[in-house]
Amino acid sequence: MEKIDGKDQSSQGDEEKEPPKSYPYSVETPYGFHLDLDFLKYVDDIEKGHTIKRIPIHRRAKQAKFSTLPRNFSLPNSGDRTYAVPPQQNWSPVVPRKISLGTQEPSQPLPLGDLPQASVQGSELNYHRKALLAKDARQAEAGSLEDVGSGRPQLLRASSMPATLLQNQVPEEPSLTSGPSTLLALPLLQDEGSVCDGAFDPAEGLMGFQASAQSVDRELGELEPAIPEQVWEGAEPEEGDLKASSHLSQPGPSSAVQSVPMDLEEVEIEHHMREAELVLTPGSATPSPPPLPSPILENDLSLDEIELSISEIPPPPPIEVDVRSIGIRVTEESLGLLETDTSSISSLKNQVLALEDKLSGRTEELARVRAALEQQEEETKAREQRIQELECTVAHLEEKLSQERASEAPDRTDATVNTDPLQELTPRESHDKNIGVNLLNTPDPECRAPRAEKNGFPWVQNNHKQSYPSPEEPVLPPQLSLPRGPEQILASSLCSCLSMELRIEEEGSEQEGGQEEGAGGLSRAAGESSWSTRESAPVIREEATSELPGAERPGRPASSPQDATIGQYVKKIQELLHEQWNCLEHGYPELASAIKQPASKLSSIQNQLLSSLNLLLSAYSAQAPEPEPKETPAPPPSTPPPPPPPPPEISPSTSLKSIMKKKDYGFRAGGNGTKKNLQFVGVNGGYETTSSEETSGEDSSPEDLSDSETEKKQDCSESREDRDLHPSCEAGQGVPEGTRNSGHTSDRGEEVSHLRAERYKPSEEFLNACQTLSQHLPETGDTTKQLLRQSLNTISQEWFRVSSRKLSSPEAVAAYLLEVQPHSPYLLKLLVNLADRSGNTALHYSVSHSNFAIVKLLLDTGVCNVDHQNKAGYTAVMITPLASAETKEDMAVVWKLLREGNVNIQATQGGQTALMLGVSHDREDMVQALLSCQADVNLQDNDGSSALMLACHQGNADLVRLLLAHPACNSSLTDKAGRTALSLVLNSPAHVEIAELLRAHSEPGRSLGPKELQKN
């Protein structure tokens, strides 16, 4: 129990610094504080006696509410008040009114940290209670987090109570002067509801308090306010306490009269104060604690003594919660889902069936794919087995050939090829072409015609049959054949289906019976005949004309053209091996590089196989003797000329290659001295280089030839027309001069030379086109007319066919130049400088194929444009370092070409020069020739590399020494990456010699001469 004195009210009121913002009786200080001056007004009213009349009306009409008390609010000075302390009036220990702070409803306990509240009894202590509550509300809002851990509600501190109150005593009630101070506190307590509204939120448990407060209004006449039981604690006040006002001694007139109205007003104001405390804020989301219990009415207690009982309520006991498990049973029938489930199950079954169908379909597709893969694997295995069989066949043929050469008995076989169409069997429409194959050099008058049937085709065996010449016909040399009679012609026509079958299979891929190199790059004389074949079965089929049963041709041995078919299959094997090698290089470059190593066993096997094939092909192609024209019967005048042999095949280039510097070359200690030859592709101006020390079969690759597919077909038609115009040349084609028998007479040799001249003569179509161009081109200067374009196209096709092939004949080129020269000098210049779709001229092709005899003929005309660039930007001079000049005559042509052309022209593809190309391909002789012809050693390509950098990059010390000997060589040039020639070789220990050469050259005041470079 603590007693509170009213003297400390002024000090407690000074702690509130916030002035009422809308209070009419206040003064603002210079520091922004407001001083409340209402107490002066109340003092005047008390002195004038207007307290009872004006207080309820004035305060009830204003209805002003404040959220907080003014900061500078203070009670009237204690000196202005007089307290009458009636002696011997104390609270009875039996009837103390204990008002609990922070009481709560039993069903809704107050959470930890809520504001503790206390009630003070008496009209003078109501203001002090409100001030403390407002202050504690602000402190609780600021420190709500700090109060969460406390286990009991926060109570009023003893330090917040007035210091002048004595324990176990009640402050004395003022007699007269305490009335104004009590009236001063009542209007402020009406606004206490606003403080509660801002601090607390509505709760469901507080609705009973509002109902109780409303019942107070109905019972004001009886002076018995209805207070809920949840708020009050302790016993009800006794009846004697309600009459405590009679014990007050109040000086002044009519004190007894004023006591009752004051009590009524105070009771009414207390009711409004409690009603304001019970007002709930509807907009808040959090429940507010129950309101503070209203203080005991003044007429219930004595006005002389008011006792404040502060009790501490322990926290409510924890609520026991019973947990029960409730099971709810829901059936499908009650929910009405039975039909829906049935339909959903059926739909799911349908989906499962559809998925099973898809799965089965995919399984079938997978099975088909697997079967296709297995079939492809089987086909691949079959191809590999076929290749192995072909290799075995080649080995068997080589062994057989060696045995035949080693045999002492001479053996000679004549093979005949019938060129008649299959449907024409009359003797007039038949023509025999005889090719004698001399397998041994020793002639023998005996001719044996072995024949056997195997797999439906004639198969040549080692058994021989003796045949005797007819007495009516003279005996001719063994390699020649006699004319046949009608019976033999008919027999050969009947058997010509065999040869026609081969031609049907190889239509479009046969080659002209002219000069063509073998797979090993072996050059043969002009007129040599060869064939190209398609892929065939491992069993070699040989075709020849056969005789009717019982019909004999005396003196005429017959056999299949063994050399032709074997040569075809040998070439096909070479092509397959070359294709296999290309696939290996593209698909497995690491394996291909390993095979290329000289120490590799696979490399040696590959080289041996290719060399064996080359020897076999050259042996068969070199043994085809040329039959004399006079021995071949001329067809009757009415007989149409026989169809010419097909022109040589021009395989389209499989890939476009360029003579740009190598991207994948590595460092080497020095040049390998290998002669490299440029193979011209001729479609987009690209080139490829081959080495004579690499696989010898590369020279006969499909990329060796220069014309495109369109030109190939046109050349075939032109060659057939040319052969039709010169049927007498058929017998002399395709046979080298060196294979003729030494026993031939001189007049026979003259006829052969005459036939050669006739062979190289341009066609009539070519001559007519030249005449047309010579008449119109000088006048018009263009080729817009259809006739002129056709003529130019004809000339272009035949000219490139004659001059631009790898095995073109210089005699043929000379014959064409001689035929064109008389027409017009302009036409000669047009013909020599004629370019194809890729911008390549005959000079480009001739240099790329190392046909320096044709190059010399073109240069001797005096109208050849040496500096003509193709679409890739290369001139004939630029590709000269890639050609192979093996003789002094060839080197003389090279020097002439370099002197007439510009050696410093750069290609448009990469900016390379002829010197860079020579260095990139390790052509030391060509580099020396270019330097002698004023080639600029310091030119740089598009990457900034010079010839010296390329030589250092390849590690060729000889070329580096040769370039540094040039007085204009600059070794400090840098490429676009900022590298010099020295920096390129410093990282490799194998180039110490080159690094020393570069350092010696870069020293100031020292220049290495050729002799010093030779010593180093």
From Swiss-Prot:
Q: Where is the signal peptide?
A: none
Stretch list, region Disordered: 1-26, 70-91, 235-259, 401-485, 506-563, 622-755
Q: Where is the composition biased (Basic and acidic residues)?
A: 401-414, 445-454, 709-727, 745-755
Annotated Acidic residues bias: 695-708
Annotated InterPro entries: Ankyrin_rpt, Ankyrin_rpt-contain_sf, KANK1-4, KN_motif
A single GO CC term for this protein reads: cytoplasm
First and last residues of every ANK repeat: 838-868, 877-905, 910-939, 943-973, 977-1007
Record-level GO BP terms: negative regulation of actin filament polymerization; negative regulation of stress fiber assembly
Q: Which PROSITE patterns match?
A: ANK_REP_REGION, ANK_REPEAT
Q: Which residues form a coiled coil?
A: 346-409
What is the name listed in the Swiss-Prot or TrEMBL entry for this protein? KN motif and ankyrin repeat domain-containing protein 4
Organism of derivation: Mus musculus (Mouse)
